[in-house]
Design a protein with these regions (language model features):
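Conserved active-site-adjacent core of cysteine acyl-enzyme catalytic domains
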Residues: 3-9, 45-159
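Active-site nucleophile-adjacent alpha helix/oxyanion-hole segment immediately C-terminal to the catalytic cysteine
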Residues: 1-54
Length: 159
């Protein structure tokens, strides 16, 4: 899949499925590391340990930030950076990052808290934004029968 006039997507973004019920955060982190480095730097459970992930609470944002800072990356997160105030600003943020080849690791309320990576945005070629979708690399892809690691979600619902 390649970007076009209404689709912005990171090409060749490899997905992986998490190995435990609580390591979606480390799996998402490893997908991003692999995108940039061509391979993971640490095994998923080692990443979970560095992040302070637990079997009951998974991984919090601070743990995610700590891991990327530990490996020497510049991190932007909701802990210290301004987040988009409106849906329109959110879409601009997503599209801008993707056009700069930057995947966006996000946590949301699915499964009581779940980490995924935004790797694509599609305006569907329409003038209104209510039908726009996000393409996610999902380490727990059970929402369809493909289990290919990709999911498509309504952008407005996600925001």
């Amino acid at each position: 899949m390649q970007s076009d006039e209404h689709l912005t997507i990171l090409p060749k973004f490899a997905t992986t499925q998490q190995i435990t019920h609580y390591t979606c955060g480390p799996a998402a982190a490893n997908m991003v590391v692999t995108y940039y480095k061509g391979k993971t730097l640490d095994e998923e459970l080692a990443v979970a340990k560095i992040m302070g992930s637990s079997k009951t609470a998974g991984t919090n944002t601070k743990g995610m930030v700590n891991y990327f800072e530990k490996i020497g990356w510049e991190v932007h997160s909701s802990i210290k950076d301004k987040t988009p105030d409106s849906y329109k600003d959110f879409l601009k943020f997503v599209e801008s990052n993707l056009k700069n080849n930057t995947p966006i690791i996000v946590e949301n309320v699915d499964w009581g808290g779940h980490w995924r990576v935004i790797i694509g945005y599609d305006s569907m070629g329409t003038a209104h934004q209510s039908d726009d979708v996000l393409i996610m690399a999902d380490p727990y892809d059970t929402t369809d029968h493909l289990q290919d690691g990709y999911s498509i979600v309504p952008a407005e619902r996600f925001f």
